[in-house]
Amino acid sequence: MKLFVWRRVGLGALTIVLTTFLVHLALYAAPGDPIGYLLNGQPATPERVAALREQFHLDDPFFVRYFSWVSDLLTGDLGISSSFNSEVSMLLATRIPTTLQLVLISIVFIFGFGLSMGIFAGLKSGGFDSFSMTIVTILSSIPAFVGSYLLINFFAVQLGWFPAIGSGDGSVLSTLWHMTLPAIALALSAGSYVARTTRASVKVESSSEHVVTATVRGIPRGKILSRHIIRNALLPIMSLGGLLLVGLMVATAFVEQAFAINGLGSLLVVAARQQDFALVQAITLIMVVSFVVVNLVVDILSWILDPRMRSDGA
């Protein structure tokens, strides 16, 4: 167990280190003086140029600049946003909770819909299976931004059941009310993917040798479903954790823009448009670290729950 965990932690740490290097290198990949890119049309006053050179350590050799930047990251100094003229850490502190709320609510929809639809479709054959997979296929083909505008037009504008913009006043009920449509828009594609994967896993487990043997021995159907079919079918779903997170983080940019939510995704869009390099750097690193942490947790849980991984010495 310890060797497995340390191996995964080491790979995750290596991924983060390589990402920091590539993100830092991106500033110097473009031709010309980085100052011209960082100014982004702002007046090139001596004070502004000097501040940028100090912030990005431009007067130091490349590796000195890199390690100075990493040192700043570790102390919480993420630089100054040129778009908002504010500390990047302060901007992130106000935006991250909103995006976390959106992602967590969408995860409830993703697994609530995906697992239930996939399990029932996997256990049933014929009409329900075909109908449910048709619905899943249609939903999976709807991009997040298209789904956002469809939901806004029907449920917010036509019916008036939900607000069209914003994230609420901070209370639990207001947050849930405002976040329901964005979370559904975010969950459409991912929930459909979970449903298809769950259905396939359930069908494979239902026809496996140990399930057939348990059925012949007269073990109650409920025990077979809970202990063998569903439990084993959920293991492949866990391995999707990292990929689902990446998809959700990317989709939040479109969904938050559509619903005018002040979250991390909409902040990334603004930063990219304004060529706010310090802000883009910070958000990119947050996404990579989140991906690494989620994958690490998923790998450990899979190792604990799946005897096959332990027997293989993974």
Predicted regions and their residues:
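Hydrophobic aliphatic residues
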Residues: 26, 30, 38, 42, ...
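Phosphate-coordinating loops and pocket residues in cytosolic domains that bind phosphorylated ligands
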Residues: 7, 40, 64, 133, ...
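An internal, D/E-rich "acidic patch" concept
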Residues: 59-115
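Short hydrophobic helices that act as membrane-entry/anchoring signals
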Residues: 3, 7, 64-68, 72, ...
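Alpha-helical transmembrane segments and their helix-start/interface "positive-inside/aromatic belt" motifs
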Residues: 8-14, 134-136
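Hydrophobic alpha-helical transmembrane segments of membrane transport/permease proteins
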Residues: 15-64, 159-178
